[in-house]
Amino acid sequence: MKKLFLIIGAPGSGKTTDAEIIAKKHSDLIAHYSTGDLLREEVKKGTPLGATIASFIDNGQLVPLEIVMDTIKNAILNSDKEVIIIDGFPRSVEQMEALDKMLQENPSIKLEAVIEVVVSEETARERVLGRARGADDNVEVFNNRMKLYLEPLNQIEEFYEKKGLLKKIDGERTIEEIVADMESFILQKIDENA
């Protein structure tokens, strides 16, 4: 049985860094992916699926949802780790629904929790615009990314809240505090459901 944790949060919430630190520390047990990594990995493998993904990316198009879902499913099922953390997913109501369907069709994957790293828009803006992460980190791009994140957020929160899967973590603290909080939650969940 694969145990899946999803981490969502605004741009600049630190969700990727948090997940990376936890997965490194427990590398015998936990694998961490971001959706972008998974797609790039598939392209690198040179599989037919990878070739399809590359054709969309090369043309600057969004990779269709069913292809993203196939990629995620393959990564989870083929991972040699029991626990999988995926950050930055789901980003939309469509992705959330597609994931739910995929989980129903694959009883060997169990969604343990959706962890939301909560930060204010001010904090997120400060972190993103204050860090040199590449050309797209300017104000307009940040505002667009923030808007894309916030638009479906209530529906996503509600959906997982109803299932008793949503865990909010305060992202305004130091990285050490956030990681400690997230790590103990994940390990406790794994133990509970061992």
Swiss-Prot record:
Domain of life of the organism encoding this protein:
Bacteria
Which pathway does it take part in? Purine metabolism; AMP biosynthesis via salvage pathway; AMP from ADP: step 1/1
Q: Which reaction does it catalyse?
A: AMP + ATP = 2 ADP
> What Enzyme Commission number does this protein have?
2.7.4.3
Which CDD domains does this entry report, sorted A to Z? ADK
List the InterPro entries.
Adenylat/UMP-CMP_kin, Adenylat_kinase_CS, P-loop_NTPase
Spans annotated as NMP: 34-63
Write out the GO MF terms.
adenylate kinase activity; ATP binding
* Swiss-Prot/TrEMBL GO biological process terms: AMP salvage
Q: Does the keyword Cytoplasm apply?
A: yes
Role summary = Catalyzes the reversible transfer of the terminal phosphate group between ATP and AMP. Plays an important role in cellular energy homeostasis and in adenine nucleotide metabolism.
Entry's HAMAP family? Answer: Adenylate_kinase_Adk
Q: Which family does it belong to?
A: Belongs to the adenylate kinase family.
Q: Which PANTHER family match?
A: NUCLEOTIDE KINASE (PTHR23359)
Subunit comment: Monomer.
NCBIfam families linked: PRK00279.2-2
Question: What is the protein name given in its UniProt record?
Answer: Adenylate kinase
Native organism: Nitratiruptor sp. (strain SB155-2)
Lineage from the top down? Answer: Bacteria, Pseudomonadati, Campylobacterota, Epsilonproteobacteria, Nautiliales
Gene, per the UniProt record: adk
